[in-house]
């Protein structure tokens, strides 16, 4: 088994990837397709990855379980979730069960899904989606704050896609420094506690558990780490 087979599952686990998504990704790999009973092999490996990755990324697994628990508590009271990122962007995490409407046409029956804010919250989607949505919102906040800083420094040309930051070659050193500084500023704050405080304020009647305790990582090391920015 080579690194490529485990890479995607490992990288997407912090985003709340599901067993089925890992399985589907493995089914597309040449190494799996070359095997007899490739689909069974893909599912076997997917289950092993789901079991093993949390044993290696222990703290990430704890945070994911905590987020899912909090999302489940709120969703079971038929409520969505809202929070403000460190960049000031308001995020709404609200998946509602659509209303199904069957329409008979001349030659077939069409099933139409109608979405509105009167439908009940979809608990499963709320729980499954919270990790990815929070992580993406924090990634976006980091990018927004980095761009604001660079703009203030006079940079006007950007090529940004999610976690890929691009500027002209002459500005790369400045980008290197600024994106590190903004990352440190964001994560020097108690991000999970701030997130929970917002939820507790919005849902005062609910008992939401405290986040996992933080470790002893010195976030300031990001400023001098040679491999943080590549």
Region spans (language model):
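Conserved catalytic core of nucleotide polymerization and phosphodiester-bond processing enzymes
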Residues: 1-230
């Amino acid at each position: 088994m080579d690194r490529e087979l485990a890479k995607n599952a490992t990288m997407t686990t912090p985003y709340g990837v599901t067993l089925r998504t890992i399985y589907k990704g493995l089914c597309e790999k040449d190494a799996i397709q070359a095997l007899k009973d490739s689909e069974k092999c893909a599912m076997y490996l997917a289950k092993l990855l789901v079991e093993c990755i949390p044993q290696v990324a222990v703290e990430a697994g704890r945070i994911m379980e905590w987020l899912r628990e909090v999302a489940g508590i709120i969703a079971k009271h038929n409520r969505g979730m809202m929070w403000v990122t460190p960049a000031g962007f308001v995020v709404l995490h609200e998946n509602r069960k659509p209303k199904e409407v069957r329409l008979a046409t001349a030659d077939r029956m069409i099933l139409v899904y109608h979405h509105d804010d009167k439908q009940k919250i979809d608990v499963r989607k709320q729980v499954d989606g919270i990790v990815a949505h929070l992580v993406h919102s924090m990634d976006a906040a980091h990018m927004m704050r980095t761009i604001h800083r660079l703009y203030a420094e006079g940079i006007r040309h950007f090529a940004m896609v999610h976690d890929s930051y691009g500027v002209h070659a002459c500005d790369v050193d400045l980008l290197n420094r600024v994106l590190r500084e903004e990352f440190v500023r964001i994560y020097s704050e108690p991000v999970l506690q701030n997130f929970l405080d917002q939820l507790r304020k919005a849902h005062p009647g609910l008992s939401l558990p405290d986040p996992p305790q933080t470790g002893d990582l010195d976030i300031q090391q990001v400023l001098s780490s040679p491999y943080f920015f590549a």
